[in-house]
Amino acid sequence: MAAAGGPAAAGRCALSSLLLLLLVVGTAQCWDERDRILLRDIKALTLYYDRYTTSRRLEPIPQLKCVGGTAGCDSYTPKVIQCQNRGWDGYDVQWECKTDLDVAYKFGKTVVSCEGYESSEDQYVLRGSCGLEYQLDYTELGLKKLRESGKEHGFNSFSNYYSKLYSPESSSLGGVVTIVVLLAIAFGVYKFFLSDGHESPPPYSEDPPYSHRYQRFSSSAGPPPAGFKSEFTGPHGATAGFGSAFTGQQGHEHSGPGFWTGLGTGGILGYLFGSNRAATPFSDSWYPSYPPSYTSTWNSRAYSPLRGGPGSSSACSGSEPRTRTASGYGGTRRR
């Protein structure tokens, strides 16, 4: 009996161990299967700009990723996008993705990217591994406002030139050149208009001291305006600014630049400073001082492709909605 009972007990123990092993393996497999999902069974995805996907074979990726478009990725960043399964084409799921976008923007190309469970060809994907890659384009309204604000045409070339001029590589050289040019212009203005240097006396001549040759240096000439050279004034009683210095014979050969040279230089200087003030995009004078025909604040600098952020929106008229629900359509890519 003891001999017979020994093998029977051992067999029962081995069977119990095998059943326990199968139970543990089956439980572990069922637990692991929870993260293995058939792609076509996914009905909807809710994705956030500040979260990452799960991963098993590859590195995690952002749930929302902008990959370009006419508006660029820095102009606007949606906080959350929801994508819904709109059908199966026999290989991939087709998606419709929606979110609230500024009226100036719309979705371009969109694609949902999911990590295949075993490989990139696996019909099963890892749960939580799906993310959205999208492009952001301008709407017709956005392009219209962009043209009205002057950023699509001449401003782009000016801003590109300005950025290159004041880039870190050329900022030092550009600053030195600018200072030198401004100092040269200031010296020219001072030399032409404001300097009253001591001129050498005229050479000895038998002409009377009050002859017409030196009439503009006679005591009868009126005093020059404050800060101006004496040769820019005429004799006593002459019209201000146009004396015999311009109609008569010059006192001597080294009297300095003429009136028209100084006038031309002053005109060029005024034009340069005036156009610089009118064209610099970093001052309020770049935008028109009169109210635009379209009552809005699109012309303000708050509307800039470089001033975006999570859920940011550009300023619009109070009579128009600032955002609306935008949709993008695309397929699936397994990685």
From Swiss-Prot:
Ranges in the topological domain labelled Cytoplasmic: 194-335
Localisation: Endoplasmic reticulum membrane
Signal sequence, start to end: 1-30
Gene Ontology BP annotations: calcium ion transport; regulation of store-operated calcium entry
Pfam families: SARAF
Record key words, sorted: Calcium, Calcium transport, Endoplasmic reticulum, Ion transport, Membrane, Signal, Transmembrane, Transmembrane helix, Transport
Name of the molecule in the record: Store-operated calcium entry-associated regulatory factor
Gene: SARAF
